């Protein structure tokens, strides 16, 4: 449990009862956050969880107003590239890049948590000329990782427009937990 979790919903009575027993034993003050979901629409459909689960294994993650981030974990580091795609505003190219980068910063922090990615992370945001915009994106990324229980350190934007950061490895990444390497490919292919 973290402070940003308001509630946990479980849609099956016996699972709810087991979770409640567990919480009463381990964290009794949080049992009031546990609820039995009784809606007609399945819980996973209501909150689009299947879509989120499917998306978590994809390399490219679409952003809400267009654009995307591309996540490439390697043995050495995690490279994340921000692409503008169809994202447009009526403002200047600089302002458009700034707005997209702000959106991307929030999604990058979210994806790092969801995928359990750690180590060195290099974020290649869309180039911005204005110093105040570069600092604004750094601030947005710092604010977005505050919810993360993993320790993070974010450096200032490099002369190449990259924001380097580190994120504590709490457990093996989702990719390493779900997939196994194919021996015939010498580690370049994966099987789920």
How does the language model describe each region?
Residues 63-192:
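Conserved glycine-centered short motifs in functionally critical loops
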Residues 1-69, 74, 159, 177-192:
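OB-fold/S1-family RNA-binding modules
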């Amino acid at each position: 449990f973290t402070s940003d979790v308001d509630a946990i919903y479980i849609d099956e009575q016996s699972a709810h009862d087991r979770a409640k027993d567990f919480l009463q034993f381990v964290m009794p003050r949080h049992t009031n956050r546990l609820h039995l979901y009784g809606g007609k629409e399945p819980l996973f459909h209501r909150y689009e969880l299947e879509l989120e689960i499917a998306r978590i294994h994809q390399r490219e993650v679409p952003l809400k107003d267009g654009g995307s981030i591309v996540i490439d974990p390697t043995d050495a580091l995690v490279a994340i590239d921000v692409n503008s795609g169809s994202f447009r505003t009526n403002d200047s190219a600089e302002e458009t890049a700034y707005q997209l980068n702000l959106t991307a910063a929030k999604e990058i922090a979210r994806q790092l948590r969801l995928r359990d990615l750690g180590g060195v992370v290099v974020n290649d945001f869309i180039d911005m000329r204005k110093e105040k915009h570069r600092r604004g994106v750094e601030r947005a990324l710092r604010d977005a990782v505050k919810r993360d229980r993993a320790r993070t350190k974010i450096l200032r934007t490099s002369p190449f427009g990259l924001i380097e950061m580190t994120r504590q490895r709490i457990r093996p990444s989702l990719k390493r937990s779900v997939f196994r390497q194919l021996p015939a490919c010498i580690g370049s292919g994966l099987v789920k």
